[in-house]
Amino acid sequence: MDEFHRCGKEDSFWQQCFLYPLFFQEDLYAISHDHYLDVSSSSRPMEHLSSNDQLSFLTVKRLIGQIRQQNHSIVLFVNCDPNPLADRKKSFYSESVLEALTLVLEVPFSIWSKSSVEGMNECKSFRSIHSIFPFLEDKFPHSNSILDARIPYSIHPEILVRTFRRWIRDAPSLHPLRSVLYDYRNSPENLQRSIIVVPRVNTRFFLFLLNYYVWECESILFSRLKRSSHSRSLSHGSFPQRTHFHRKIKHIIIFSRRNSLKSIWSLKDPKIHYVRYGERPIIAIKGADLLVKKCRYYLLIFRQFYFHLWSEPYRVCSHQLSKNCSSSLGYFLRVRMNPLLVRTKTLDELFIPVLITNEMDPIVPIVPIIGLLATEKFCDISGRPISKLSWTSLTDDDILDRFDQIWRNLFHYYSGSFDRDGLYRIKYILLLSCAKTLACKHKSTIRVVRKELGPELFKKSFSKEREFDSLPFSSKAAARSQRERIWHSDIPQINPLANSWQKIQDLKIENLFDQ
């Protein structure tokens, strides 16, 4: 891959016109063959691996040669081996070809994406989900409305191929991509659809398609929003704080006026802020309702004309931050007013004015999470703890570790909320559910179990809370610990319960608009 990158940088003609010969390089199929075996061996038992899982480069070349002679390249997935025994081998050959196709297409895409990211000095990527919230805390309180825009996964295969043609002029190299997409569209599960739905599976090929599709949408959207923004700038990263005056000068523009020696100093304050996690981009807008309606209309028209795709209205929802809450990343996001008392003393009298500032207030959805716990049989629908009968066959240590891990993950993920009282209600449910599960296993009572285990119940969680409360916020850490929020930098993915609740919220919105 490094060799491909170096060649691509040295000769732009190569990356445009010489991708197709890479399909006939045996080294490429050896790499894809080894990668597929590594992935498949980790996901299936060792007894399913046999010596028949060998790759014939001659067969692969013959398959690629037949691609041009087929309408939809059914030969890619059917009759790819003369042996009638090999349904599994048919899948093996098709996956090997997909791996090779992905490797070839990743070469120019990695070069484009790297060059585009280098041109965006403000764009930053972090591994933790909680890195999004400091950006929201800085930008959301100064915005009026937000647009909750979902990236559509439904797109015609030919439109997807034409987006590649904008960057790759080597038309033969896109024939395998077109054949794979049409073959997937003609599969039994998609016979009733006129468009291809990019599946949410963890194969390298479809993940690459998803990443390219999102990158194509955002690269065009950024340039359009920059042109339409009032200040000619788009915020999609964390700017320096305005309290640092020596950095502040970098973000100031000077406009010279004619017939005057004075200059107008204007701060480059972006009016549009963009942040995305997964398929949920959020656009915060500071302006009148007319500007919000124009942005929403623009997003719908952009998808319709650029991707020839009719986007459902519910996929671009607008919310006023002062009135409504928006659900994202397992939180209810809202902006609340925070009054500040400022004492101003003069020689004659004392003034105590009240300053009102806006502050982002993420709320933990306690009731929906309890409903999800009821679905998983930790409690009933009213929130009363019950025993987890499916775990009674485990050992006591495994039961304790599982309940403890659920609570630690929840407490760790929702540590950014001011109001954590509801979390202790969830802890109470898990604690009694754990005790009832152990009592059901040993055919005893909760009192006996708590007497025998004592502090062993949620021992790790208690230590985690003590560590959380003892963080050095200031000299008055004990008093401020309940009023401070902490965004952690070690959370690579959304909490499972929060993710389940977020999907339920999305389905509710879709059903509301379908009615």
From Swiss-Prot:
UniProt cross-references to HAMAP family, sorted A to Z: MatK
Primary location recorded for the protein, binned into one broad class: plastid
GO biological process, one term: tRNA processing
Gene label: matK
Protein name, entry field: Maturase K
Statement: the UniProt record of this protein carries the keyword Chloroplast: yes
One annotated GO molecular function: RNA binding
Disulfide bonds: none
Keywords: Chloroplast, mRNA processing, Plastid, RNA-binding, tRNA processing
Function of the molecule: Usually encoded in the trnK tRNA gene intron. Probably assists in splicing its own and other chloroplast group II introns.
Taxonomic superkingdom: Eukaryota
Listed GO CC annotations: chloroplast
Pfam families found in the cross-reference section: Intron_maturas2 (PF01348), MatK_N (PF01824)
InterPro entries documented for this protein: Domain_X, Maturase_MatK, Maturase_MatK_N
Cellular compartment(s): Plastid, Chloroplast
PANTHER family: MATURASE K
